[in-house]
Amino acid sequence: MTPDDLLEEFRAAGALLEGHFILSSGLHSAVFLQKMAIFSDPVRTARVCAGLASVIRDRYGAVDLVVSPAIGGIVPGYETARALGARAIFVERDPGGPFQLRRGFSIPAGSRAVMVEDIVTTGLSSRECLAALRDQPGEVVGAACLIDRSGGRADLGAPLVALATLDIPNYPADQLPPDLAAIPAVKPGSRATTPG
């Protein structure tokens, strides 16, 4: 699957939105990628995650385990793991707390794991997920996502490979361009923020 194929999947699912959006990072953007429109379709999800699995194999080789941040990363993590023939686990947190492995999940010694995200904007969730894995006996070889909307600038503290890399401008609330400021903001994402 090429980056253009992935974007066509988003368009066909009605998941590539234009307007004024407050992202889960708190930044504002004229473009929102409504990934749940993709993940609500099992066939489409399998297709895009098989594409990501191919990119992971090319970059990192064989992996035994896919680790994703809850909640948004669970579906793409699971489906990517399935395409890789790997196990899928996830990190989760108490509200306001750090991510941690629970439910008996671990990265055993001798295993190779990759952290899989859906969409990376600032890389905050990815960095927090990777931090939760630092003390595990197995090796975390890197990270992967369907779309890196930072244009490759997000620093995760680990290698990142994306099925598509886009350079979509994002703005702090006090630095909006006039055309974006003229449109009422909506918050379609998942992380609680205060509009501003």
From Swiss-Prot:
SUPFAM superfamilies: PRTase-like
MF annotations from Gene Ontology: magnesium ion binding; orotate phosphoribosyltransferase activity
A biological process term (GO) from this entry: 'de novo' UMP biosynthetic process
Cofactors named for this entry: Mg(2+)
This protein's UniProt keywords: Glycosyltransferase, Magnesium, Pyrimidine biosynthesis, Transferase
Coiled coil: none
Binding, 5-phospho-alpha-D-ribose 1-diphosphate: 117-125
Reactions mediated catalytically: orotidine 5'-phosphate + diphosphate = orotate + 5-phospho-alpha-D-ribose 1-diphosphate
Residues that hold orotate according to the record: 121, 149
InterPro entries given in the database record: OPRT, Orotate_PRibTrfase_bac, PRibTrfase_dom, PRTase-like
Enzyme class: transferase
EC identifiers of the protein: 2.4.2.10
Organism superkingdom: Bacteria
Annotated Pfam families: Pribosyltran (PF00156)
Keyword Membrane: no
UniProt KW Transferase keyword: yes
Pathway(s) where this gene product acts: Pyrimidine metabolism; UMP biosynthesis via de novo pathway; UMP from orotate: step 1/2
Quaternary assembly: Homodimer.
Protein family (similarity comment): Belongs to the purine/pyrimidine phosphoribosyltransferase family. PyrE subfamily.
Entry function: Catalyzes the transfer of a ribosyl phosphate group from 5-phosphoribose 1-diphosphate to orotate, leading to the formation of orotidine monophosphate (OMP).
Name of the featured protein: Orotate phosphoribosyltransferase
Taxonomic lineage: Bacteria, Pseudomonadati, Pseudomonadota, Alphaproteobacteria, Hyphomicrobiales
